[in-house]
C-alpha cells in the first residue's frame, strides 16, 4: 500500500486529536490510519461505533461479501417490532456496510466493478427488506391485496438509473417506480381497501422509511419523479395503467431511462416476468431505430444547457468527456439495435460495451479506451463522494481533498491526476463526437469583407464606412459608429480572458454584417450591445452566438422587433439557448402541454433544493414567455391565442407552486386528517380578473383567492401537529412566498390576494362555507362583478364544483335593474377618476372612456342583470364568450356583440404590442376613434339610458 503523501501525513495529526481515547491508544494499523485520513465519513462513523473498526481490522472486506448482505440484514431486523425500530436498523446497517465499502475502495482491496456491485446490491437489499417488512405490516393492518381470483398481489419496485444497472455510486439518491399487477381489494382486514389505496399507502410508508432523516441519518434519498406523469401522477400504478402510459404517452427520455430499469428482489416470479415482457417493446424497437441519435443529441444539448445554467465546472459526470457521455455512447447502440440484437439488452454498461466491441459497432481500441476511462471516472467519483458521504461530481478546490484524491488514485500530486483525467475525458469526447456530435458538417466560415472586421476593430475612419453603411442616413451612420466605440470602451472595463476576446472578434463582424444590413440598424444595435455587455464575461453564451449563425439571426430579428425581448435576454441570458431551435422558438408549447413540459423541466432539479426549484420555475416561465412573444411578433399567434398561452402558462406555474408548497407543508406538519379517507387536498385556487377571464398580458399580475374545505376540528397527522385550518393558512402563505420571492431570475408573478372576502383585512385563505356566506350576505356589487370573471384554476373536483355552484347562485340572484345600473356606473366613475389617463391628448387604452374597462363593465352588468332569467350567461368567465352568450340569449343584438368583440380584441392586441415595445398603455388621442365611439354608444345604451 502506498504511504500517505506529505500533506496527508500532516493532516493525520489533526485526525489523532479527534479520535477518542480508546481508539487513540490502540495501535492502529497502517490501513486504518490511511482510511481515517482519507475519509471524514469513515472517521465520524468509527468514532460513533468503535466496534466497526475492530471488525474491519479482524474481518477485512471481501469482494463477494455482498452475497451475505441479505442474511446480515435479516438478522439485524429479527427483533424489530415497529416502524421506528425498522428505520433505525436500516440506517445503522447502511452506514456500517458503507464504511466497509469505503475501506475496501480507499485501499483498493477489490476492483472498481466489485465496488459498484456492492453499492448497488446494498441498496437493493435495504429496499427489498423494507418493502417486505412493510408489506407484512400493512397486510396485518388492512388485509392482503388480492385480484379478482383471490390471488395475493405484490408490490413490484423498478430500480432505475445506476441502481437498475448495478452501477450505483457511493452517495446517490435512488430512482424508483412502484407497480402492482391487478386491480382488486384487500381480504382479511378490518375493512376493505381497493388495491390502489393499499399500495399507495404502503408506498408512502416505504418512502418515509427509506428517505426521512432521523438522528441516525437516512437510508437513501428516494426520487419518484421518473414514474408516469411524474409528481402529478399516482404514486403506484397497476400493470395495465403502466402499459397504457408507455404505449400512448411514453417519451424518448423515458425510453432512455427504462433501458436500465431492473426489478428489485425476486425478479423471476410470474409477475416480474409479466412486467418485463410488457416494458420490453417500449424500450427496444424491433427495427433499427436511427431516430435515437437525434433524441440523444437533443438530450445531450439539454445537459450542456443545464451545465451552463447551474454554472457547473470540473464536473466529471456532466462535463465534456464525462461519465454521462460514456453512458450515452453505450445506450445509443442499445436503443438503435437492441430490438434486433438481444445481447445488447443488458442493463449494465461494461458488459454492454464488450458486446458492442464484439459486434464491431465500435473499434476494439475505442471500446477499450471507453472501458478504462469509465472505470477511472467511476473510481474518482466514488472516492470523491466517500470523503464526506456527499452526492457530488465536482472536483474539489481545496488542497486537502485534492491531496486525498491524488493519493487514493495513486498519483504523486494533483497536477498528475488532472493530467490523466484530461486524457481520459478527451478520448471519451472524441468517440462521443464521432457518434453523437452534431451531424451537420461545420459550414465554412462566411467570407466577410475585410471592412466588417476593420469596423469592429475600430480601424475604419468615418469616411471609410460609406461602402458598408451606405444605405443608412448620416445620423444613423454616426450613431452606429458611436455605439461600436462605446461598446469597445465598456469591454475595456471588464475582465475578459483571451478566449472571450477571441470569440468576440469572431462574432462581432458577423453580427455587424447582419445588423447593419437593416434600415433600423442603429436602434437594433443599441439593444444588442446592451445585451452583449451583460454576457461578455460568460464566454459560453458568446460561443453559442458565434457557433450558431441561425441563433444570431433570431437574436437580431427579435431584438429589432421588441425591446421587451431584448431586455429579457439581457437580464436572463440563459434564454439564449431558446434561440437554437426555430421549431420551438416560434412554436409555443401546446396550451394543454405546459404542465407536462414544466414537470419534465423540474425533473432536472433536486427536489429538496428550494433555491434551484425557485430558479427553475422562473427560468421555465421566461423561456415560455420568449416563445409566446416570438410567435406573437411573427404573426403566428392572434391576440386571443396569446392570452390563452399566457393563461395556460400561469396555470401550470400555479399547479407547480401549490405542489411544492404542499410537499413542504406536509413534510413539516403532516396532512390534515380530514383527507385520510378521500382523494385530493381539500384546497382550491380561484383566479380573478385577467387570469379568470383568460386574458393575461405579458406583464399581468395574478389576482388569486384561496379556499379550503377543512372542518373546524381537523388536525394534521405529522409529528408537529397543528390545527387543520392553520395548515391551510400556512400553505397559502407559502404559495405567496414562492411566487413573490425575488431570486437572481426575478419573481415568478406579482400575486394580488385582495379580492378575498373582506379584502386585505380578511383571512388569506377562506373556507368554502365562509366564502359562500360572505358572497350572499356581505359582498358589494363590485365584488359580484369580479365574480363574473372568476374561475377555479387549481383544486379538487368537489371544491371546484362547490365554487361553481356558489358563483352561479350569486350571479343568478334577481336584481333591480336601475339600482344595479347606478351601482355599476358609480363604481366605473370612481375608477375613472382614480385611474384615468393623466396624459393630455393621449388615450389610455384600458382606463379611459371607450376603453377596455368600459367593455368589461358592460358585460359584467348584463350578466348580473339578466342571469336570473338566463342562467346560461354564467357559463364563461371571459368577455369574448360572454358577448357571444349575450347574443345567443337575445340580450344583445348579434351585430353589437360582434362589434364590441372586435373592438375589445383590437384594443387588447394593441396593449400586447405596446408591451413588446416596452411602451405605456396609452396612444395618441386620434387612435381607435371608431372603436371608442362604438363602446361609448354601447355604454350609453346599457348603463345610462336603459
From Swiss-Prot:
GO terms under cellular component: cytosol
Span list, region Adenylyl transferase: 449-946
SUPFAM superfamilies referenced in this protein's UniProt entry, alphabetically: Nucleotidyltransferase (SSF81301), Nucleotidyltransferase substrate binding subunit/domain (SSF81593)
Keyword terms, alphabetized: ATP-binding, Magnesium, Multifunctional enzyme, Nucleotide-binding, Nucleotidyltransferase, Transferase
The reaction(s) this protein catalyses: [glutamine synthetase]-O(4)-(5'-adenylyl)-L-tyrosine + phosphate = [glutamine synthetase]-L-tyrosine + ADP; [glutamine synthetase]-L-tyrosine + ATP = [glutamine synthetase]-O(4)-(5'-adenylyl)-L-tyrosine + diphosphate
Molecular-function annotations in GO: [glutamate-ammonia-ligase] adenylyltransferase activity; [glutamine synthetase]-adenylyl-L-tyrosine phosphorylase activity; ATP binding; magnesium ion binding
Gene Ontology biological process terms in this record: regulation of glutamine family amino acid metabolic process
InterPro entries documented for this protein: GlnE, GlnE_rpt_dom, NT_sf, PII_UdlTrfase/GS_AdlTrfase
Family: Belongs to the GlnE family.
Name by which UniProt lists this protein: Bifunctional glutamine synthetase adenylyltransferase/adenylyl-removing enzyme
Organism in which the protein naturally occurs: Shigella boydii serotype 18 (strain CDC 3083-94 / BS512)
Lineage: Bacteria, Pseudomonadati, Pseudomonadota, Gammaproteobacteria, Enterobacterales
Amino acid at each position: 500500500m502506498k504511504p500517505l503523501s506529505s500533506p496527508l501525513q500532516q493532516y493525520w495529526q489533526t485526525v489523532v486529536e479527534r479520535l477518542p481515547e480508546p481508539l487513540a491508544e490502540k495501535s492502529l494499523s497502517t490501513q486504518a490510519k490511511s482510511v481515517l485520513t482519507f475519509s471524514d465519513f469513515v472517521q465520524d462513523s468509527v468514532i460513533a461505533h468503535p466496534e466497526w473498526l475492530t471488525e474491519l481490522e479482524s474481518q477485512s472486506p471481501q469482494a463477494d461479501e455482498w452475497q451475505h448482505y441479505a442474511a446480515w440484514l435479516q438478522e439485524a431486523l429479527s427483533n424489530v417490532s415497529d416502524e421506528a425500530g425498522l428505520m433505525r436498523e436500516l440506517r445503522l446497517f447502511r452506514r456500517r456496510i458503507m464504511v466497509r465499502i469505503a475501506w475496501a475502495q480507499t485501499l483498493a482491496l477489490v476492483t472498481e466493478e466489485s465496488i459498484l456491485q456492492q453499492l448497488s446490491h446494498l441498496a437493493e437489499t435495504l429496499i427489498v427488506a423494507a418493502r417486505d417488512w412493510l408489506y407484512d405490516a400493512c397486510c396485518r393492518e388492512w388485509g392482503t391485496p388480492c385480484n379478482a381470483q383471490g390471488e395475493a398481489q405484490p408490490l413490484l419496485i423498478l430500480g432505475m438509473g445506476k441502481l437498475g444497472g448495478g452501477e450505483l455510486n457511493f452517495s446517490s439518491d435512488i430512482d424508483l417506480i412502484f407497480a402492482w399487477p391487478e386491480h382488486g381489494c384487500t381480504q382479511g382486514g378490518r375493512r376493505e381497501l381497493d388495491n390502489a389505496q393499499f399500495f399507495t399507502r404502503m408506498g408512502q410508508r416505504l418512502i418515509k422509511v427509506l428517505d426521512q432523516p432521523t438522528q441516525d441519518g437516512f437510508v437513501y434519498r428516494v426520487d419518484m419523479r421518473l414514474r408516469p406523469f411524474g409528481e402529478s401522477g399516482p404514486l403506484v400504478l397497476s400493470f395495465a395503467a403502466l402499459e397504457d402510459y408507455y404505449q400512448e404517452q411514453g417519451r424518448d427520455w423515458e425510453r432512455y431511462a427504462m433501458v436500465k430499469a431492473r426489478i428489485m428482489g425476486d425478479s423471476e416470479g410470474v409477475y416480474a416476468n409479466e412486467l418485463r415482457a410488457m416494458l420490453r417493446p417500449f424500450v427496444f424497437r424491433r427495427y433499427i431505430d436511427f431516430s435515437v441519435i437525434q433524441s440523444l443529441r437533443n438530450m445531450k444539448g439539454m445537459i450542456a444547457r443545464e451545465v451552463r445554467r447551474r454554472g457547473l465546472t470540473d464536473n466529471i459526470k456532466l462535463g465534456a468527456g464525462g461519465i454521462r457521455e460514456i453512458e450515452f455512447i453505450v445506450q445509443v447502440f442499445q436503443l438503435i439495435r437492441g430490438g434486433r440484437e438481444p445481447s445488447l439488452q443488458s442493463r449494465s454498461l461494461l458488459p454492454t460495451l464488450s458486446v458492442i466491441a464484439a459486434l464491431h459497432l465500435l473499434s476494439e481500441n475505442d471500446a477499450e479506451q471507453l472501458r478504462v476511462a469509465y472505470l477511472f471516472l467511476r473510481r474518482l467519483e466514488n472516492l470523491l463522494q466517500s470523503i464526506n458521504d456527499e452526492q457530488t461530481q465536482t472536483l474539489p478546490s481545496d488542497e486537502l481533498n485534492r491531496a486525498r484524491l491524488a493519493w487514493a488514485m495513486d498519483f504523486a500530486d494533483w497536477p498528475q491526476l488532472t493530467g490523466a483525467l484530461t486524457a481520459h475525458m478527451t478520448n471519451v469526447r472524441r468517440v462521443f463526437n464521432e457518434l453523437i456530435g452534431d451531424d451537420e458538417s461545420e459550414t465554412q466560415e462566411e467570407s466577410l469583407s475585410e471592412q466588417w472586421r476593420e469596423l469592429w476593430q475600430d480601424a475604419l475612419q468615418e469616411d471609410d464606412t460609406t461602402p458598408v453603411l451606405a444605405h443608412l442616413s448620416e445620423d444613423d451612420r454616426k450613431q452606429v459608429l458611436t455605439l461600436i466605440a462605446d461598446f469597445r470602451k465598456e469591454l475595456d472595463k471588464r475582465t475578459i480572458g483571451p478566449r472571450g476576446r477571441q470569440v468576440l472578434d469572431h462574432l462581432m463582424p458577423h453580427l455587424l454584417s447582419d445588423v447593419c444590413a437593416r434600415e433600423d440598424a442603429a436602434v437594433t444595435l443599441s439593444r444588442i450591445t446592451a445585451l452583449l455587455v451583460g454576457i461578455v464575461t460568460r464566454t459560453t453564451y458568446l460561443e453559442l452566438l458565434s457557433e450558431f449563425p441561425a441563433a444570431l439571426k433570431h437574436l437580431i430579428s427579435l431584438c429589432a422587433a421588441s425591446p421587451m425581448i431584448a431586455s429579457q435576454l439581457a437580464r436572463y441570458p440563459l434564454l439564449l439557448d431558446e434561440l437554437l431551435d426555430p421549431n420551438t422558438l416560434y412554436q409555443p408549447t401546446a396550451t394543454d402541454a405546459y404542465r407536462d413540459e414544466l414537470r419534465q423541466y423540474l425533473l432536472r432539479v433536486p427536489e429538496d433544493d428550494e433555491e434551484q426549484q425557485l430558479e427553475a420555475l422562473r427560468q421555465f416561465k421566461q423561456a415560455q414567455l420568449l416563445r409566446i412573444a416570438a410567435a406573437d411578433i411573427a404573426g403566428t399567434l392572434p391576440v386571443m391565442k396569446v392570452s390563452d398561452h399566457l393563461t395556460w402558462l400561469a396555470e401550470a406555474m400555479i399547479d407547480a407552486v401549490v405542489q411544492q408548497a404542499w410537499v413542504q407543508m406536509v413534510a413539516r406538519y403532516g396532512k390534515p386528517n380530514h383527507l385520510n379517507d378521500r382523494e385530493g387536498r381539500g384546497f382550491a385556487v380561484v383566479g380573478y380578473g385577467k387570469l379568470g377571464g383568460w386574458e393575461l398580458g405579458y406583464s399581468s399580475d395574478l389576482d388569486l383567492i384561496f379556499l379550503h374545505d377543512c372542518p373546524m376540528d381537523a388536525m394534521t397527522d405529522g409529528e408537529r401537529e397543528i390545527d387543520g385550518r392553520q395548515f391551510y393558512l400556512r400553505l397559502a402563505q407559502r404559495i405567496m412566498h414562492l411566487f413573490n420571492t425575488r431570486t437572481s431570475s426575478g419573481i415568478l408573478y406579482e400575486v394580488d390576494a385582495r379580492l378575498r372576502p373582506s379584502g386585505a383585512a380578511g383571512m388569506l385563505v377562506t373556507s368554502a362555507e365562509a366564502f359562500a356566506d360572505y358572497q350572499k350576505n356581505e359582498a358589494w356589487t363590485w365584488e359580484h362583478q369580479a365574480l363574473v370573471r372568476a374561475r377555479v384554476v387549481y383544486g379538487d373536483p368537489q371544491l371546484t364544483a362547490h365554487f361553481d355552484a356558489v358563483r352561479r347562485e350569486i350571479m343568478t340572484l334577481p336584481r333591480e335593474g336601475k339600482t344595479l345600473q347606478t351601482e355599476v356606473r358609480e363604481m366605473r366613475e370612481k375608477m375613472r377618476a382614480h385611474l384615468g389617463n393623466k396624459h393630455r391628448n393621449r388615450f389610455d387604452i384600458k382606463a379611459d372612456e371607450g376603453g377596455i374597462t368600459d367593455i368589461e363593465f358592460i358585460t359584467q352588468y348584463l350578466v348580473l342583470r339578466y342571469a336570473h332569467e338566463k342562467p346560461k350567461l354564467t357559463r364563461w368567465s371571459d368577455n369574448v364568450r360572454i358577448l357571444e352568450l349575450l347574443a345567443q340569449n337575445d340580450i344583445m343584438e348579434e351585430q353589437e356583440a360582434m362589434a364590441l368583440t372586435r373592438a375589445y380584441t383590437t384594443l387588447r392586441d394593441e396593449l400586447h404590442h405596446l408591451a413588446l415595445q416596452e411602451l405605456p398603455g396609452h396612444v395618441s388621442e386620434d387612435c381607435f376613434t371608431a372603436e371608442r365611439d362604438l363602446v361609448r354608444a354601447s355604454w350609453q345604451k346599457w348603463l345610462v339610458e336603459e
